[in-house]
From Swiss-Prot:
Entries under Pfam families matching the protein: Aminotran_1_2
Keyword field: Ethylene biosynthesis, Fruit ripening, Lyase, Pyridoxal phosphate, S-adenosyl-L-methionine
Taxonomic source organism: Glycine max
Protein name: 1-aminocyclopropane-1-carboxylate synthase
Residue positions, PTM N6-(pyridoxal phosphate)lysine: 279
E.C. numbers: 4.4.1.14
Entry function: Catalyzes the formation of 1-aminocyclopropane-1-carboxylate, a direct precursor of ethylene in higher plants.
GO biological process: one example: amino acid metabolic process
Gene3D superfamilies with a match to the protein in the record: Aspartate Aminotransferase, domain 1, Type I PLP-dependent aspartate aminotransferase-like (Major domain)
């Protein structure tokens, strides 16, 4: 009982009590608002609709049907019990051979079989979160940095920085060219890091992009490859949305550039891919993360580090059987793309009816929604004010662009694949009602002439000042409490 009189934080490490996890962000506050008042069509029809979670529930029925028709794939059924002891016993860090083989084949299939993957280069980890952290531990030391094009997934601040002690240096991208990554932006970020005496060890790209829902074209990927080879830094390509592409242009993996574009000089030892089944197959709870490295030393070291976050053998066993079912996988990927395209069409079409535009996209589980016309002023404070209204009054959890480190106020990521058709229609109706109530402040085809000035002011600030940190110009978002 005496311990209760002591400040509990004094007994803990500085790392765990600090703010490095990144929870002090609107991205996570929106989740808390939903958790406190979740929408339910019957039990809580006025609750908050969760559109801040990039989860793929559009094909869950296909997986459920496969499991029902293949009970022997699970060691927890009468049909599969004979393999229980062999699978439940301790396995080495390499994982089940049949699982690694199945994942390698699936990765090739989601890339149109234009490239093959070596099962012996696959390292497992606890989801893409674990895969990113293990990769970072292998490639960089505390104080080193990775370049990351903005906007980027807020979880990278946790996954790459929190326990590794590295820095993330933003590569500026903006709406003037639909947020496309350029060679000049890469050079500017690299030189800025050098001026600040920060050693850059790598470049992290997300392809397809979260939050943009776009894919990188071949020329951009060639530029990236040339850049990292010239600077002698690592490239980590996050490709966890590779099978969510539902229309042209097609997804091009960095592996294809490495294998096919032989006119580009590049050291294969610098190239690494992070993959997962969470988005493509809708298995976030299975925590299947994959590191695929062309560097033998990284494969060896990552395998040792993966001992802290392995994928259970029961999960490996089930998924090996599923991914080796060629007929199922083929039909699943086709139907998944069809359903994602339909949901994207319905949602963006519904927004367009009230004059809301989104960045043109063809991948992912979300859209990058443009609400700049609804801002009172072209400032980050106005974006936060609008976001709070959307949470509190519209009762929808969307993620503001600032939480993705976007420097242009007014962009929001909206997820549409984690709900049924009815919830989508209710969400669209709420958005329409809100826009119609505020139509007088919307200016059609408004030119955002403030954009260049904002960029200039942000460039003069320290990097930490445009992050969600105690020094951020974005006010620390209080825990949002949505009310009925």
């Amino acid at each position: 009982m005496g311990l209760m009189d002591v400040d509990q934080t004094q007994l803990l490490s500085k790392m765990v009590i600090g703010d490095g996890h990144g929870e002090a962000s609107p991205y996570f506050d929106g989740w808390k608002a939903y958790d406190e008042n979740p929408f339910h069509p019957k039990e809580n029809p006025n609750g908050v609709i969760q559109m801040g979670l990039a989860e793929n529930q559009l094909t869950s029925d296909l997986v459920e049907d496969w499991i029902l028709n293949n009970p022997e794939a699970s060691i927890c059924t009468p049909e599969g019990i004979n393999d229980f002891r062999a699978i439940a016993n301790f396995q080495d860090y390499h994982g089940l051979p049949e699982f690694r083989n199945a994942v390698a084949k699936f990765m090739g299939r989601t890339r149109g079989n234009r490239v093959t993957f070596d099962p012996d280069r696959i390292v497992m980890s606890g989801g893409a979160t674990g895969a990113h952290e293990v990769t970072t531990f292998c490639l960089a030391d505390p104080g080193d940095a990775f370049l990351v094009p903005i906007p980027y997934y807020p979880g990278f601040d946790r996954d790459l920085r929190w326990r590794t002690g590295i820095k993330l240096v933003p590569v500026m991208c903006d709406s003037s060219n639909n947020f496309k990554l350029t060679k000049q932006a890469l050079e500017d970020a690299y030189e800025k890091a050098k001026e600040d005496n920060i050693r850059v060890k790598g470049l992290l790209i997300t392809n397809p992009s979260n939050p943009l829902g776009t894919v990188m074209d071949r020329n951009t990927l060639r530029t990236v490859m040339s850049f990292i080879n010239e600077k002698r830094i690592h490239l980590v390509s996050d490709e966890i949305y590779s099978a969510t592409v539902f229309s042209h242009p097609s997804f091009i993996s960095i592996a294809e550039i490495l294998e096919e574009d032989t006119d580009i000089e590049c050291d294969r030892n610098l190239v690494h891919i992070v993959y997962s089944l969470s988005k493509d197959m809708g298995f976030p709870g299975f925590r299947v993360g994959i590191i695929y490295s062309y560097n033998d030393a990284v494969v060896h070291c990552a395998r040792k580090m993966s001992s802290f976050g392995l994928v259970s053998t029961q999960t490996q066993y089930l998924l090996a059987s599923m991914l080796n079912d060629d007929e199922f996988v083929e039909s699943f990927l086709v139907e998944s793309a069809k359903r994602l395209a339909q949901r994207h069409r319905v949602f963006t079409g519904g927004l367009a009816k009230v004059g809301i535009k989104c960045l043109q996209s063809n991948a992912g589980l979300f859209v990058w929604m443009d609400l700049r016309q609804l801002l009172k002023k072209p400032t980050l404070d106005s974006e936060m004010e609008l976001w709070r209204v959307i949470i509190d009054e519209v009762k929808i959890n969307v993620s503001p662009g600032s939480s993705f480190h976007c420097t242009e106020p007014g962009w929001f990521r909206v997820c549409y694949a984690n709900m049924d058709d009815m919830a989508v229609q209710i969400a669209l109706q709420r958005i329409r009602n809100f826009v119609l109530q505020n139509k007088e402040i919307m200016v059609p085809n408004k030119k955002h002439c403030w954009h260049s000035n904002l960029r200039l002011s942000l460039k003069t600030r320290r990097f930490d000042d445009i992050m969600m940190s105690p020094h951020s110009p974005i006010p620390q978002s209080p825990l949002v409490k949505a009310t009925i």
